[in-house]
From Swiss-Prot:
Origin species: Kluyveromyces lactis (strain ATCC 8585 / CBS 2359 / DSM 70799 / NBRC 1267 / NRRL Y-1140 / WM37) (Yeast)
PANTHER family, alphabetized: MITOCHONDRIAL DISTRIBUTION AND MORPHOLOGY PROTEIN 34 (PTHR28185:SF1)
Free-text comment on this protein's domains from its UniProt entry: Lacks alpha-helical transmembrane segments, suggesting that it resides in the membrane via beta-sheet conformations similar to those predicted for other outer membrane proteins and porin. The SMP-LTD domain is a barrel-like domain that can bind various types of glycerophospholipids in its interior and mediate their transfer between two adjacent bilayers.
Protein name per its UniProtKB record: Mitochondrial distribution and morphology protein 34
Region described as Disordered: 26-51, 379-399
Quaternary context: Component of the ER-mitochondria encounter structure (ERMES) or MDM complex, composed of MMM1, MDM10, MDM12 and MDM34.
Compartments, as annotated in UniProt: Mitochondrion outer membrane
Amino acid sequence: MSFKFNSGTFEDNTFNEQIRDRLTRALNPSRFENPESTSGQDGSDSQKKPKKLDILKSGVTVRQVDFRTIPQLEILDLDVSAQSKSLLKGICKISCKDAMIQITTEIEANLLLLYEAVSPEFTTPKLISNDSFTVPITMTFDHIELEAITNIFVKNTGVGISFNDVNLDFRFECSMKLLQTSIEKRLKNSMETIFKDVLPSVIFNMSQRWFTHGPELVEDPSLIATDSALSEVTPMTILDDSDLQDLSPATMLRLSTLISSRQSLALNPISSHTVATIPGCIERQNLRRFSSRIPSLNNYYAQEVGKHRPSKILPTRENSNSIIANKMASDFIQNSLPTEVLESGSYNIREIANIQQRIYERNNEENVIRRRRIRLGKRSKSVQDTAAKMHPVPESGSLHPIIQPSTTPAATVTPLLSPQPVVAKSPPESMTPNTLPEQSPYTSNIAIDKIPDLTLPQAQLQKDKVPMRLNLLEESYFKSDLKDLRNSLYSPMRNQRFYVQSEDGARPSLLDGKRFSFVGLANQQMKWGNDDLPPPYKAN
């Protein structure tokens, strides 16, 4: 046995408007609550309110309902009882294709609960916004295909229906693409509740006007909570561990990068006199980490307190935009030493003093720490006086400095003294540069009378009659062949000017065919006596 619906009912769009209105009332029972049905004789029923979702800022509104194809109904079984109260029982098969429903609502984005009233003023930064903000969201269910077996009970007061063997498929689109996968998964898990509670109540309320012509709305007692304790909103989990797997890793990486780039836990940007994007402000997502790093005794002894004190569960809030002044949370914000630490004697006086000093330094912004200055090139008067006593300055009339002999014992190692050239002698006549006019760039304009006479240190020591040990270099200094070579190489003079021998000129026959070499004197790491560089010897 089967029948068809009247096509005219679906063409004039009156049926769609009725379905849209009934779905809106079913999804928002608190907005369309009948005051007569909730008021009792003793007034106890007036406190019974339906459960309200904390995440929703406003109610759910059904904006559009469209049945593009006419639904089909097939009667599988029918039982009519002839009693004073007429009763009709039947089993039907309902099939619906290509339907569309669009709903809108607003969710509240207030993920942090701030205890600003109980936090110290000097450690609590200025918040840009402490209020919640609403985000509109639109959800569209398109291409809905439904096949279900229903049990129908028809009385003279209304129509009751129950769904069995439901097969549902639809395409879901959300205005917030980040939450689309998570919402779609939750909706598919909650479809059982929709077909067991929501749709039967909607159909029953619609049938009241058809059968009794009474008031359009009769609340189902099952939708009203019987316990007043249900009025308190329990905390909800927005995202489970299974939901995190459905989120896009690329999107989560972008969000984490954006959040980490905006975090700032330093106290310098919080001060009003420093340069910052928003002076004296901190972002709300950083407040919890900022408060946990504030130097206080409770933060330092938090682990010790947690061993003796049971975990405290903060009370939940009815609305997400309300702020609760929690007294239990204030115990952990105040700078006081816990009683558990005093009883166990596990405190440290130095740590307590350091924490108090850090709090004072952070609170006192006018305390400017002076930087340490280091001056180079100057010595104090005491150091200069001691240096003058140890090494007296010679008289201005003396041109040659006199080396003071040391009074160290004989066992000490004597310093190495470099051989110095004797008084410069005039070069032989054979080396006069009369035939070399092109070597004028290599000559010097220093006059002879301005050059001081060079005196050996050993000769000066002999005048003072101070015995001193000679090293190998000083012993070889007094040999005759080295004297002649040194006189010719150190200060050759031509026409009262210093002259540097060129490679083209004639070489003096001083060595007489003998080989003479120096090993290791040209190395920069070695030093020739007290001079930085060795004398200008040339390689053969």
